[in-house]
């Protein structure tokens, strides 16, 4: 695997070709392995290299290959990570068009792509379109799956985020609570995603001035994060800071100083 380690440290085109040819020959172009390598490159933050990799793979596929829609989706993720939001939307739209031609209207891929499109609109500050896309994802998943499908937790969380940004705090709270309820069904009690949900709910209570409820949810978040994350993880530091600010608003300056300093 030395060829892979070498290539991941370089963005040069000849290194990319070397890596791609190696993977194609070793794994006979098995989709799972090629996808895994592309994901590894992307997750390392080497977005330009990931884009070249996906494009090279795309160029070798016949026009009717079922992997094309997946590659469009992955290119959309790369463009999103690079902050190229309009390009990301174009890739996602291409992926969506293929899925709508080749799958039933309630297929999981279609709902997931609507969610991805919503994420990009949210980053562009277009909350209306983001909410529209998230609601489409929810509607499709309700038709095809149980209302407590794990992905619904993500959709509800995203809707809650939009409502919080729009200062519709009670609506935000409702969707964050729905997201948390689903996560509890599938995740271990100390999973970091539960810590995120408690933190999000605490943030909304903060906006509503419900400081005792804020501290309750921040404490729950902190307990989970201390168990599941490295000691120096920024989410832990953020939770301490948030709790310190709440104590400051409650005029408990001693506790505030301990947490903030």
List each model region and its residues.
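TPR-adjacent "capping" and linker segments in tetratricopeptide-repeat scaffold/adaptor proteins
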Residues: 17-33, 61-67
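Structural signature of alpha-solenoid helical repeat scaffolds
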Residues: 25, 63, 102-105, 147, ...
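Alpha-helical segment of the N-proximal tetratricopeptide repeat
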Residues: 29-60, 77-83
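Conserved alpha-helical positions within TPR/SEL1-like repeat arrays
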Residues: 35-43, 66-81, 108-123, 150-165, ...
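Amphipathic alpha-helical segments of tetratricopeptide repeats
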Residues: 57-59, 96-101, 138-143, 180-185, ...
């Amino acid at each position: 695997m030395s060829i892979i380690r070498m290539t991941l440290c370089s963005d040069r085109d000849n290194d990319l070709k070397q890596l791609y040819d190696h993977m194609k020959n070793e794994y006979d172009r098995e989709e799972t392995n090629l996808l895994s390598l592309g994901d590894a490159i992307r997750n390392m933050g080497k977005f330009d290299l990931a884009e070249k990799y996906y494009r090279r793979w795309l160029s070798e596929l016949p026009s009717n290959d079922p992997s094309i829609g997946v590659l469009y989706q992955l290119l959309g993720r790369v463009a999103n990570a690079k902050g190229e939001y309009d390009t990301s939307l174009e890739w996602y739209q291409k992926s969506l068009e293929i899925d709508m031609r080749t799958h039933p209207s309630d297929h999981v891929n279609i709902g997931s792509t609507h969610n991805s499109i919503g994420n990009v609109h949210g980053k562009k500050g277009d909350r209306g379109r983001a909410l529209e896309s998230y609601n489409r994802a929810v509607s499709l998943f309700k038709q095809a799956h149980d209302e407590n499908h794990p992905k619904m937790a993500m959709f509800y969380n995203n809707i809650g985020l939009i409502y919080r940004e729009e200062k519709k705090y009670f609506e935000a709270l409702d969707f964050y609570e729905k997201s948390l309820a689903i996560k509890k069904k599938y995740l271990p009690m100390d999973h970091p995603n539960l810590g995120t949900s408690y933190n999000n709910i605490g943030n909304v209570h903060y906006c509503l001035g419900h400081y005792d409820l804020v501290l309750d949810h921040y404490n729950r978040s902190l307990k989970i994060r201390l168990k599941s994350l490295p000691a120096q993880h920024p989410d832990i530091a953020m939770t301490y800071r948030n709790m310190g600010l709440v104590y400051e608003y409650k005029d408990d300056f001693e506790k505030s100083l301990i947490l903030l300093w």
